[in-house]
Swiss-Prot record:
This is Photosystem I reaction center subunit IX. It is found in: Plastid, Chloroplast thylakoid membrane. Keywords: Chloroplast, Membrane, Photosynthesis, Photosystem I, Plastid, Thylakoid, Transmembrane, Transmembrane helix. Disulfide bonds: none annotated. InterPro entries: PSI_PsaJ, PSI_PsaJ_sf. PANTHER family: PHOTOSYSTEM I REACTION CENTER SUBUNIT IX, PTHR36082. The gene is psaJ. It comes from Capsella bursa-pastoris (Shepherd's purse). It holds the Pfam family PSI_PsaJ. GO terms for biological process: photosynthesis.
Length: 42
């Protein structure tokens, strides 16, 4: 039961960190390449 409580307290923290870093990455990509339908480095 203690392991389940530990998992339930760690999973929201990790998912929040993941979504915040993903959102920051997408924001920076859109800042460097605004309105990019095709990326020039491919």
């Amino acid at each position: 039961m203690r392991d389940l409580k530990t998992y339930l307290s760690v999973a929201p923290v990790l998912s929040t960190l993941w979504f915040v870093s993903l959102a920051g990455l997408l924001i920076e990509i859109n800042r460097l390449f605004p309105d990019a339908l095709t990326f020039p480095f491919f």
